[in-house]
Amino acid sequence: MTDHDERTFVMVKPDGVQRGLIGDIVTRLETKGLKMVGGKFMRIDEELAHEHYAEHEDKPFFDGLVSFITSGPVFAMVWEGADATRQVRQLMGATDAQDAAPGTIRGDYGNDLGHNLIHGSDHEDEGANEREIALFFDDDELVDWDRDASAWVYEDLADHD
Ligand code: DAT
Ligand code: MG
């Protein structure tokens, strides 16, 4: 049986919020068949920004990254589905929005490396999804629910013959 309940952390960054793209980005993930299990409209403070981007601490762009991510509200989310972490990365597109393929979120809406609209956990960094979810959400902020459409997304959940 396929594991349908992998969870991943996703965030609409301040540029996406300011440009009114929360709805479009959520729609992309919903229509792919992923299920939202948590969502929080919030501001990231310095401390959380440092923790979230700890892997980039030594990079020359770190200070700019922290000041960007704390510059306005973000929409933090947890999404669930089969292979969810990698699936979200594919929907996001390449880090530099100018290189991101048309059809991806960054490719369709972005034009910049820093202002690239969306964060998603790195599927090549084992456990990054669980770490980031725990950093942003308490367990009781995540909702277990059955999305009826899942049986029409995943064939192995279907009850037809
Ligand atoms: P991603 O957001 O695709 O996971 P990442 O984790 O390598 O990319 O980097 C985190 C963010 O930092 C990225 O969304 C944009 C910014 N960034 C990455 N590389 C950069 C660079 N060389 N110069 C400036 N900003 C950069
Ligand atoms: Mg990353």
Curated annotation (Swiss-Prot):
It is found in: Cytoplasm. One of its GO terms (molecular function) is metal ion binding. The active site is at residue 119. It comes from the Archaea. It is an enzyme of class 2 (transferase). It holds the Pfam family NDK. ATP binds at residues 13, 61, 89, 95, 106, 116. It catalyses: a 2'-deoxyribonucleoside 5'-diphosphate + ATP = a 2'-deoxyribonucleoside 5'-triphosphate + ADP; a ribonucleoside 5'-diphosphate + ATP = a ribonucleoside 5'-triphosphate + ADP. Its cofactor is Mg(2+). GO terms for cellular component: cytoplasm. Keywords: ATP-binding, Cytoplasm, Kinase, Magnesium, Metal-binding, Nucleotide metabolism, Nucleotide-binding, Phosphoprotein, Transferase. One of its GO terms (biological process) is UTP biosynthetic process. Its EC number is 2.7.4.6. Belongs to the NDK family. Major role in the synthesis of nucleoside triphosphates other than ATP. The ATP gamma phosphate is transferred to the NDP beta phosphate via a ping-pong mechanism, using a phosphorylated active-site intermediate. This is Nucleoside diphosphate kinase. It comes from Halobacterium salinarum (strain ATCC 700922 / JCM 11081 / NRC-1). The gene is ndk.
